[in-house]
Amino acid sequence: MIVEELKLLPSSKAAKDYLNNQNDMLSFFDYNIHQPTVFQQRLSDLQEQPYDRDALSKALLSYQKRFAFHDKAAQQVEKLKDPRSVVVIGGQQAGLLTGPLYTIYKAVTIVLLAREQERALGVPVVPVFWIAGEDHDLDEINAVPIEKNGRWRSHRIEEKRKRIASEAGLNKETLAKWLATVFRSLPETEHTLPLYERVKTLAGRSNTYTDFFAELLLYLFRDEGLVVFDSGDPSFRTLEKSCFHMLIQKTKNVQGAFAHQVKKLEQAGYGRPIITEETNAHLFYVEEGSRYRIDYTGENYELNGKNQTFSREELLEHLTLHPERFSNNVVTRPVMQDALFPVLAFVAGPGEISYWATLKRVFHECGMKMSPVVPRISATCVPSAVQKWFAEKQYSYEEAIAHGLEKEKEGWLEEQTPWPIDQVVEEAITQIRHSHKPIKDLAEQIGETPGKLANKNWSIIESQLRFMERRMKRHVRERFEHELSKFDEAERWLKPNGLLQERHDHVIQLLNIVGDDFIPRLISMNINKMGVHYLVKL
């Protein structure tokens, strides 16, 4: 495996300006990650914050032991008992097969940054992956793309109702059939069967979406000591209770702080990354597996979509009795994260950078500073056949990843075609339209009905000429089908379905080609430069 660096900035203006050290964007954050002393400063600031390390370590250790490949993760959890220890953290929804590749790249960034800062700071730094198990939109996590007859389709586990991922039971038989279809869609290699058996075993151990996600992530990072944490697991709710209590007490302040920061961000030209109603209390209440948004109007708390209201005292009483019924939204989840963990750095994708820019005043209202936000790595992987073809064509990887290969494909085909199909057809249409005009004019003079008929007649003539044009082009394409398929194969890797590979493909597709040591090999290459898009040559 070889890694090259490409310059390919994110499309988001906020993320781009953040990477480029632009003051307009950096002013929305407490720390400037471009400063060489940023992590020393953060470490110093963390000494002033209290954390219940024993309770946190105990809960995390118990959670790791639920999964098959937990040994290295459990060793890392022990470090958290050290009062000097800190964490590098990031998270994602519990996607099937760990979801799109950016999840893997986020975890790789967490591991690499934790190792780097443990050496630099001389204190234990634990890599933690926060699984957003309280998310309830299963349609965002219950499918992966598979390829069939050269076309992509979404392969989904159908869900009849909305439930949070930590409680959404996975039918073992349904999951096994779903998994078999995924592997049948892959090209068979020496790795396919053992990989299938391993993933099938991990799936068999899993009862929920988050279980399956954690089993697979811990297996993939089994040598790296990545610690997993499910924010939707009831066992962690007792730890979270005091933060929920504070957020309920400060609801009005949090609402105002968030609204103020969103307005400032919009005025600075960065739009509104989070759009919600002013009454949103930025908390959810879970009942019978369904999640209801809590609204606050200044007097009472109300469950959105359910005719149920609480006073502040009643809601706090529910929290005391049933902390497992409460969960965070996108605004308060970062606050909960930094309240539970001594966060040295938060690893973020481009979208997260945008929405974290709305949270500075929210953190301050809760008595905290925002942790430093570090962009995750970005990458595109290419197999050897595509590498060889690309070298022959001398195309730009940056251009292909950013824009696809359609322009190059059509240009190449035009160069190979000695027949001026477009020119001849356009000239014929112009000439025939000119010859047809007297008929059309005469018909319109005779009456409305003949006039309409003449227009329809011309439409039929033109459509037949266009039909002939398409058929001639199709015949030419069939003549060069073998070479054109190489363009399609390259684009399938570099811009699948018009998306960045990391936003479309899943890790099993790569492991099927290179084996299940792909992640340790990737980590050994220390690919953690900010603002770089890595080209990974498999």
Swiss-Prot record:
Documented EC number(s): 6.-.-.-
Keywords: Ligase
Pfam families in UniProt: CC_BshC (PF24850), Rossmann-like_BshC (PF10079)
Name of the protein described by the UniProt record: Putative cysteine ligase BshC
Gene from which the chain derives: bshC
Biological role stated in the UniProt entry: Involved in bacillithiol (BSH) biosynthesis. May catalyze the last step of the pathway, the addition of cysteine to glucosamine malate (GlcN-Mal) to generate BSH.
Family the entry assigns: Belongs to the BshC family.
InterPro entries: Bacillithiol_biosynth_BshC (IPR011199), CC_BshC (IPR055399), Rossmann-like_BshC (IPR055398)
Listed GO MF terms: ligase activity
Keyword Ligase (UniProt): yes
